């Protein structure tokens, strides 16, 4: 994950048990750990132990991007097939309104306050080794997307 810095990071160089986390967030790209890959295994048990990841905190005030490399179950994969599967999932079914599909050449600030939890960037789909491995990217406004999911949850509870 390439992640915008957050409020728990230092604004000036200071002391921290992790020397990298001690550095000024707005001035540095900071490699660090992430709990996101482990969290996926909690939500999707069949993926437990099959994902790992790292995070680089970057000096942007908001919006992050996930770069995910995976080995497709059907090889060789094509970028068109991968993109179409994501596009279809964004238009119908349980991910409608949560996953968005984008083909415009946008940058991080363009996704600020996007209500979706994930905005798939079809322009960044890359095939490696003739489609034996695929890299995809998806943008997100961490706080705003999460807040919208909490509003969805509150509305669901209110309808019970």
Task: Give the residues covered by each predicted segment.
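Short beta-strand segments
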Residues: 1-2, 139
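C-terminal substrate-binding/catalytic lobe of Rossmann-fold NAD(P)-dependent oxidoreductases
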Residues: 3-134
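Glycine-rich phosphate/pyrophosphate-binding beta-alpha loops
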Residues: 57-61, 139-146
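Internal hydrophobic alpha-helix adjacent to the cofactor/substrate pocket in enzyme cavities
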Residues: 148-160
């Amino acid at each position: 994950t390439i992640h915008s810095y957050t409020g728990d990071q230092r604004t000036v160089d200071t002391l921290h048990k992790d020397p990298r986390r001690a550095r000024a967030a707005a001035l540095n790209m900071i490699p660090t750990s992430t709990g996101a890959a482990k969290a996926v295994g909690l939500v999707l048990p069949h993926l437990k132990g099959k994902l790992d990841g790292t995070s680089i905190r970057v000096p942007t005030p908001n919006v992050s991007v996930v770069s995910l490399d995976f080995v497709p179950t059907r090889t060789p994969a094509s970028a068109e097939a991968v993109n179409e599967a994501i596009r279809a999932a964004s238009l119908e079914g349980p991910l409608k309104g949560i996953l968005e599909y984008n083909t415009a050449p946008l940058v991080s600030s363009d996704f600020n306050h996007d209500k979706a939890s994930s905005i798939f960037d079809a322009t960044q789909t890359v095939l490696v080794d003739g489609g034996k491995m695929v890299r995809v990217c998806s943008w997100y406004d961490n706080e705003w997307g999460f807040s919208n999911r909490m509003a969805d949850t509150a509305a669901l509870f209110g309808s019970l």
